[in-house]
């Protein structure tokens, strides 16, 4: 087994700690799990058809980055409070150069946007990584010097899934700020935060997996949602079987907007059953999918939903090529595939919608790969797998929408 040892040094620096009033630290509110009762409450208060934004819920540790006006030092917080600089928290110190760059850039852009100085700027996010059990990925053991002592960088989560990277990373999902020391924190609306995040080179942030009315978001199957993170942190060519995501964080699109007066919950967790923290059985029996009925009704209403393509493919050139690939799934190509098959498989009732969709998807991929650039053909394995899934999905949707007409046209008695 390969092992690498890396050491980073950080000098202990004095910290001006927060006073007893806790005016700097902003505890990140716990998010309620979704269930049928809470979804029905959204319907009852008229928020069900509002726009909602779902991002991947990363399995890690809550982590905040604080920039305070007049202080040169950046502060870092876990869920329970701001940490002294010598506290060992999974080895986050190794990320400090990047974290400082992120918060400095966000502060500059936000102050420019607000056209005023801000007392505190805060990026909320998740610290994650430290485990990736793939035979082609070397096991790593890194240490970082904290207060003159070597401390081992440890995995934030040790479950068999989801696994993201052998290294430690930060995933940003919120921006908050205080104009004055005595003021309250203001949360940026999701789209405003994303506008700033995407302008910071190297910053990993919560992109929308799916957005729209809750009827559309709830049709997304979190039970079969493969994490989108590994390709973003260099693991795209090292797929893991069953690397399911923890779930989604679903926010109201107007959360943080001035004047927004919600009548119901504005943030919910849609968690994979494997990550439910309680059982509905008093005897702690098998976990159940509390969203099963809601998801079934939503699928009947909005259809099965896949992640937005932009959350899977983030390179602009690859994204454009991916959209072109999906444009190959069209009615004219379906007619061409049918002409190659003939009528006999339909006469003998041997052809099913899934079989026809598979033939269509294969034809799409064959033609696309024949004409596309080598750089697109050689995209990471995980992204290739995702794109194949999208092609099959779109092929099935097209075939199913025309199946009755296809059966009619493939009948030997059909005439124009």
UniProtKB/Swiss-Prot annotation:
It is an enzyme of class 6 (ligase). It catalyses: ATP + (ribonucleotide)n-3'-hydroxyl + 5'-phospho-(ribonucleotide)m = (ribonucleotide)n+m + AMP + diphosphate. The keyword Transit peptide applies. Pfam families: RNA_ligase, T4_Rnl2_C. Signal peptide: none annotated. One of its GO terms (cellular component) is kinetoplast. ATP binds at residues 29-31, 56-62, 79, 126, 173, 269-271. Its main location: mitochondrion. The active site is at 57 (n6-amp-lysine intermediate). SUPFAM superfamilies: DNA ligase/mRNA capping enzyme, catalytic domain (SSF56091). Its EC number is 6.5.1.3. It is found in: Mitochondrion. RNA editing in kinetoplastid mitochondria inserts and deletes uridylates at multiple sites in pre-mRNAs as directed by guide RNAs. This is RNA-editing ligase 2, mitochondrial. It comes from Trypanosoma brucei brucei (strain 927/4 GUTat10.1). The gene is REL2.
């Amino acid at each position: 087994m390969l092992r690498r040892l890396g050491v980073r040094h950080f000098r202990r620096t004095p910290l001006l700690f927060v006073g007893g009033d806790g005016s700097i630290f902003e505890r990140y509110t716990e998010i309620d799990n979704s269930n049928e009762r809470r979804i029905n409450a959204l319907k009852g208060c008229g928020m069900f058809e509002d726009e909602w934004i779902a991002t991947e819920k990363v399995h890690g540790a809550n982590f905040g980055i604080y920039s305070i006006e007049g202080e040169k030092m950046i502060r870092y917080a876990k869920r329970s409070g701001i940490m002294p600089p010598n506290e060992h928290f999974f080895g986050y110190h190794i990320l400090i150069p990047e974290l400082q760059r992120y918060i400095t850039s966000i502060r500059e852009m936000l102050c420019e946007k607000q056209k005023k100085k801000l007392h505190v700027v805060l990026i909320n996010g998740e610290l994650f990584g430290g485990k990736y059990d793939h035979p082609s990925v070397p096991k790593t053991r890194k240490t970082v010097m904290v207060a003159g002592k070597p401390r081992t960088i440890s995995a934030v989560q040790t479950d068999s899934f989801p696994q993201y990277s052998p290294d430690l990373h930060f995933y940003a999902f919120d921006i908050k700020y205080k104009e004055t020391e005595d003021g309250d924190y203001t949360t940026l609306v999701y789209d405003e935060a994303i506008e700033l995040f995407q302008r910071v080179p190297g910053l990993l942030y919560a992109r929308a997996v799916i957005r729209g009315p809750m009827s559309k978001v709830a049709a997304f199957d979190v039970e079969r949602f493969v994490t989108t993170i590994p390709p973003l942190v260099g693991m795209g060519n090292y797929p893991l079987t069953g690397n399911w995501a923890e779930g989604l964080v679903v926010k109201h699109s107007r959360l943080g907007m001035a004047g927004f007066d919600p009548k119901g919950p504005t943030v919910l967790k849609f968690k994979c059953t494997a990550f439910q923290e309680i059982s509905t059985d008093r005897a702690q029996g098998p976990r159940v999918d509390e969203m099963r009925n809601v998801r079934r009704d939503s699928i009947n209403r909005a259809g099965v939903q896949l992640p937005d393509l932009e959350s899977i493919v983030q390179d602009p050139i690859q994204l454009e090529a991916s959209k072109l690939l999906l444009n190959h799934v069209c009615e004219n190509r379906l007619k061409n595939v049918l002409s190659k098959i003939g009528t006999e498989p339909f006469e003998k009732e041997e052809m099913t919608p899934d079989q026809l969709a598979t033939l269509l998807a294969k034809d799409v991929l064959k033609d696309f790969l024949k004409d596309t650039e080598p750089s697109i053909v050689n995209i990471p394995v995980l992204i290739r797998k995702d794109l194949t899934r999208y092609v099959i999905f779109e092929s099935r949707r097209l075939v199913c929408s025309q199946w009755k007409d296809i059966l009619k046209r493939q009948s030997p008695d059909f005439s124009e």
